[in-house]
Regions:
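Active-site-adjacent segment of SDR/Rossmann-fold oxidoreductases
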Residues: 62, 84-94
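Active-site loop-to-helix junction immediately N-terminal to the catalytic Tyr of the SDR YXXXK motif
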Residues: 17, 64-72, 84
Length: 164
């Protein structure tokens, strides 16, 4: 199973945080990942095998000023869920991998405080790139688990004033 969930809020720093936005990010990014994993485990445990691939973010590995507080915290939580799944479910034949991409050209970029120019979007990770990585992971022998895959666009956008 491959699950990709993620939302963010426009006002991302500590000074402008709001509880409603925080709750929405946690509900979608963390609870969404948890609930999808639970549903998959109900099917995979009786089979004695399965692979769960979840998208977190590079913001779940290292803090990113662009990502902000709520998103970064939520993606760190997704990383922890994945680590715990491998510890608890590996002996049941279930493996979990978390993808940690940098900027991906998806609709979430439309909600950035400062829009990402189209010419820069084309240089970011594309959805097809993520798909190829998922296929690669699924083709690995069941005895192999990639716990985390960190993916970066070759092009690194400079941080703009007001982005972090």
């Amino acid at each position: 199973m491959y699950k990709r969930q993620g939302i963010n809020i426009t006002n991302r720093n500590w000074g402008g945080g709001n509880l409603e936005g925080w709750d929405e990010v946690i509900d979608v990014n963390v609870k969404g990942a948890y609930n999808c994993a639970l549903a998959a485990l109900e099917v995979m445990r009786p089979q004695g095998e399965g692979t769960i691939i979840t998208t977190s973010s590079k913001a779940g590995v290292n803090y990113s000023p662009r990502a902000g507080v709520a998103y970064g915290a939520s993606k760190h939580a997704v990383m922890a869920l994945n680590q715990l799944m491998n510890i608890e479910e590996g002996n049941n034949g279930i493996r979990a991998c978390v993808l940690c991409p940098g900027e991906v050209e998806t609709p979430i970029l439309d909600h950035r405080p400062i829009p990402v120019p189209q010419e820069e979007r084309e240089r970011l990770i594309q959805s097809e790139d993520m798909g190829e990585i998922v296929v690669f992971i699924m083709k690995l022998p069941a005895r192999v688990t990639l716990n985390e895959v960190i993916i970066s666009p070759t092009y690194t956008r400079p941080l703009q004033p007001g982005e972090g």
